[in-house]
Structure formats: C-alpha cells, structure tokens
C-alpha cells in the first residue's frame, strides 16, 4: 500500500475547509442566504483538494472524486425551486456515495469473501423494495419516489458497509466512516423533510452542519485507511 504524504499544503487546504465551514454555518445560523450560498461550494472543494494532496495516488483520486461529486451536488442544489437542478444534484451525490463504497470495498477486498458481496447486494435490493412505496407517498410522484428509494438505499449502504467492514477487517477508521455515513443520512433525510413536507427556521444550518461533518468523517476516514 502506498505511503501517504503530509505536506504543509495538505493541512493548509484542511484549514481552509474548516474556515469555510465555520463561515458557512455562521451565515446559515444567521439566515444570511446570499453569503451562505457564496461560501457553500468552497467547503467541500477545499476538502477535495486536501484529499488528493494528502494521498496523491489512485486511491486518493477515488476518494477525491467522491468528494468532488459532492461539491458539484452542493453547487447544483444552490438553485432552490428548480427540479432539474435538484435531480442533477442528487445524481451527483449518488455517484459520490458509490465512490466511497468502492473505496471501502477496495481497501477491505483481501478480507472479503464472495458471500459478503452477495449479502451487500441483496441488502441493497431489499432496501430499495422496502423504501419505494414510502418515498412515492412522500414525493407524490412515482418517478421521483423510485429515484428517492434508490438514492436513500445507496445512502444507507455507506454506514452499513462501513460497520460490517469494521468487524471484518478490524480497521478502526471504519467507525469514523460509519459515523460519517449516519451523519450524511441525517442531513439528507432532514433535507427531504424540508423540501417535501415542511420548511423549518434555520434549516440550512442543521442540513449543512451534519452534511459537512459527514463529508469530513468519510473522506478523512478513508484517507487514513489507505495511509
């Protein structure tokens, strides 16, 4: 496994991520929408650059791609009230989750047997089947509901796989990744609630707080696995 490098530049971008996150959450709490939107795309972008500088190999590139797709999703979701941007953003996040899942399985592959992959696949399809009716009812659309079931199932698979791999490999960093996956799940479920059911005051503060925590835990946990 390649050794990670830790140049000053990597920690500089991590510091920029933290700084941008502080500003983002401050503006979200104060409900300064314009300023919050100006800062939002930069948060995960700094985390993306941190990933590839911290681990400049193809493992780092895969993790970076997952974070970058999150950054693209962040930018697309700035267009509130536009269905096509919302769908495009969700697709970007979806493939970002798949990058994270691929990175986890890649790391754990020496410890996995075929039965593990079969179990993951069956669990994924059971989740889709069990969620498709509720998501259709919430979104009041068959197409959006079906897509929502696919997205939510993929999102659930991130912490589920992480916790399974924690037990299989004994790698403690999977606990960090699993907690990040749960935080991502909280963020997106609350986002769906505010979009399809009821808006809340300071909703962006809670959405972005859990989301940025999730991205950090997942990305940094994966980087440390391969370091």
Regions flagged by a language model, labelled:
Residues 1-227:
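Polytopic alpha-helical membrane-helix bundles and their juxtamembrane interface segments
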């Amino acid at each position: 496994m390649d050794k990670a490098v830790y140049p000053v530049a990597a920690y500089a971008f991590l510091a920029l991520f933290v700084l941008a996150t502080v500003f983002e959450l401050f503006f979200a709490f104060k409900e300064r929408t314009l300023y919050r939107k100006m800062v939002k795309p930069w948060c995960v972008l700094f985390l993306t650059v941190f990933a590839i500088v911290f681990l400049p190999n193809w493992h780092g590139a895969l993790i970076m791609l997952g974070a970058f797709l999150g950054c693209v999703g962040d930018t697309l979701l700035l267009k509130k009230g536009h269905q096509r941007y919302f769908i495009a953003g969700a697709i970007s996040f979806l493939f970002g989750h798949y990058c994270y899942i691929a990175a986890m399985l890649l790391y754990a592959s020496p410890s996995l047997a075929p039965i593990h992959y079969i179990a993951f696949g069956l669990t994924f399809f059971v989740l889709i089947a069990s969620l498709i009716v509720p998501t259709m009812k919430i979104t009041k659309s068959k197409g959006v509901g079906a897509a929502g079931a696919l997205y939510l199932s993929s999102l659930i698979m991130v912490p589920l796989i992480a916790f399974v791999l924690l037990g299989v490999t004994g790698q403690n960093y999977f606990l960090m990744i699993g907690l990040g996956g749960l935080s991502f799940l909280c963020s997106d479920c609350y986002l769906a609630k505010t979009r399809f059911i009821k808006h809340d005051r300071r909703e962006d503060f809670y959405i972005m707080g859990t989301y940025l925590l999730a991205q950090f835990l997942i990305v940094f946990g994966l980087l440390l696995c391969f370091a």
